[in-house]
């Protein structure tokens, strides 16, 4: 006689499966992205953000971002299994099948789109869908393997969140929101190129034409330094157009100076582990920069 399956015996399996699905959504990346969405929402209005677009917008955008991340896991499952940084992901390890990953990504993305379309506005729903396609299909499935400028071109999809937050509240485009997009668009190459330097051998092993693989590490270091200077200029644009005040100006200047210095060190004073230090600094740079935007908005404006 077969032994009945107990509820308690199935709990560990459920826990492992749930964690695997959650991991596929790249929660840390989505969390940073949602911060930029929130800032876009807050800067779009002079006072408090209306509750419905705030909650529904954050939920819908988070779901579609998680869907894009899951599709990234699905498309990259072969190369992920060959790289030390990613070999332990759910798909290469067989914790989730490709079919289930596709169903999960499609379901999550569809639900997110429905939430945005019905509870926020169609403009935000379609813009978020375009970002999903841009990241999951245009970048991951094509650009990543096609050109060393993959990060530069594909970075536009990842730079959209502040605009999505803005349109979720206002249902319209605004030049100020585009300035925030420009900041993230300019921030993306030095952020990813620093990681690519650290993981150059792994990218070369799986034939991904990241800039350090195709043009060499020294050329990439120069590009990182130049982009941090461009980023510093981009970060000043909100001040120049009167969008932000002195609180943001001071914070932005300090953060830009720090990023340029780290990039200069990488170029002229490199040592083991410095590329990853630059990569981590870039994350804090973006997070603190957008927190400064928020602080300035409520303290100065």
UniProtKB/Swiss-Prot annotation:
| Pathway given in the UniProt record | Porphyrin-containing compound metabolism; heme O biosynthesis; heme O from protoheme: step 1/1
User: What is one GO cellular-component annotation here?
Assistant: plasma membrane
**Per the record, what are the reactions this protein catalyses?**
heme b + (2E,6E)-farnesyl diphosphate + H2O = Fe(II)-heme o + diphosphate
Membrane-spanning residues: 29-49, 51-71, 101-121, 123-143, 150-170, 177-197, 223-243, 244-264, 274-294
Q: Where in the cell is it found?
A: Cell inner membrane
Q: Which GO terms describe its molecular function?
A: protoheme IX farnesyltransferase activity
Cite the InterPro entries for this sequence.
Answer: Protohaem_IX_farnesylTrfase, UbiA_prenyltransferase, UbiA_prenylTrfase_CS, UbiA_sf
Write down the EC number.
2.5.1.141
> What UniProt keywords are attached to this protein's entry?
Cell inner membrane, Cell membrane, Heme biosynthesis, Membrane, Transferase, Transmembrane, Transmembrane helix
At the top level, the lineage of the source is Bacteria
Look up and give the membrane topology term.
Multi-pass membrane protein
Its GO biological process annotations read: heme O biosynthetic process
**Main localization of the protein described in the UniProt heading:** membrane
Coiled-coil annotation reads: none
Miscellaneous remark of the record? Carbon 2 of the heme B porphyrin ring is defined according to the Fischer nomenclature.
Q: Which PANTHER family match?
A: 4-HYDROXYBENZOATE SOLANESYLTRANSFERASE (PTHR43448:SF7), PROTOHEME IX FARNESYLTRANSFERASE, MITOCHONDRIAL (PTHR43448)
What function does this protein fulfil?
Converts heme B (protoheme IX) to heme O by substitution of the vinyl group on carbon 2 of heme B porphyrin ring with a hydroxyethyl farnesyl side group.
Q: Which family does it belong to?
A: Belongs to the UbiA prenyltransferase family. Protoheme IX farnesyltransferase subfamily.
Task: State the name under which the record lists this protein.
Answer: Protoheme IX farnesyltransferase
